[in-house]
């Protein structure tokens, strides 16, 4: 797939900027806080309808403006698609494909696929379980767009069940309350779908990431990735998962009443990353942790390509400076011209002459993009 054009209006610090991509590799050069990352964020939003910066829509809309618009033209093996995403300071998003508004956002997902790799991704190793869940969910949305709807359903039931538990906590009702049993059943049904899909996705991703990690580390380290669902998963069969889920809910009924919140379910899952059987967050240097994240990202690229049958876009946000020369070379050698790649950097010294000669170089300054570094 190839992103031909991108048009940003009132998005972040872009007033009205159109970009035409003329090479498989585009290097965006500029000082910090000029808008390089914002452009990559716009592409990420078109791919996943999510921002890895966890920004709210109103934060994405330029000050004094009611809405922001991201338009793109994408070329795939199946033909050319025009994508449009409107973000409102107050109100719902609107998505359109080839000029036609879509009622369901999940029908927009899967048209553009992209893997984002930024310096923030070290949090995959060092951060909380929520960071790893969000990463896995974002990947799943691209592998199986209906997952966005499944996850939304689960989160909605979870919020409503939590509100009901809070209500029980403040009243004389007991955990035997019949309305709670209804929420339990809905939580189990929707949560089981989340658990099974997360389990399947990691089962496919883990061996790819392990192989990349072995290659990058020179076979000196062994990476293991395991899904540790909050609900005990003996078999990935709907009936068994639902039974285990319901059983654990019943076991935790009293603590849930006491705390007024749901203590069982995929919102408490963990993805465990270990290197040489030691938890990765406790293991070694930042360089080794970067190797792990690089392996995960290369595995994401590979898995998405296997599933959608086309190479996804790769968005590299200021990561080359974070990698040592050998890891830089591993990444750049893997990319070549196979993946359309957008790279942000503050200087061009990280790239050799061959890369520079085969890349489109754009200069970014205060939300304006030019082919020369003297924007007026």
Curated annotation (Swiss-Prot):
One of its GO terms (molecular function) is single-stranded DNA binding. GO terms for biological process: DNA replication; DNA synthesis involved in DNA repair; double-strand break repair; SOS response. Keywords: ATP-binding, Cytoplasm, DNA damage, DNA repair, DNA replication, DNA-binding, Nucleotide-binding, SOS response. The keyword DNA repair applies. ATP binds at residues 30-37. It is found in: Cytoplasm. Coiled coil: none annotated. InterPro entries: DNA-binding_RecF (IPR001238), DNA-binding_RecF_CS (IPR018078), P-loop_NTPase (IPR027417), RecF/RecN/SMC_N (IPR003395), RecF_2 (IPR042174). GO terms for cellular component: cytoplasm. CDD domains: ABC_RecF. The keyword Cell membrane does not apply. Pfam families: SMC_N (PF02463). The RecF protein is involved in DNA metabolism; it is required for DNA replication and normal SOS inducibility. RecF binds preferentially to single-stranded, linear DNA. It also seems to bind ATP. PANTHER family: DNA REPLICATION AND REPAIR PROTEIN RECF (PTHR32182:SF0). NCBIfam families: recf. Belongs to the RecF family. This is DNA replication and repair protein RecF. The gene is recF.
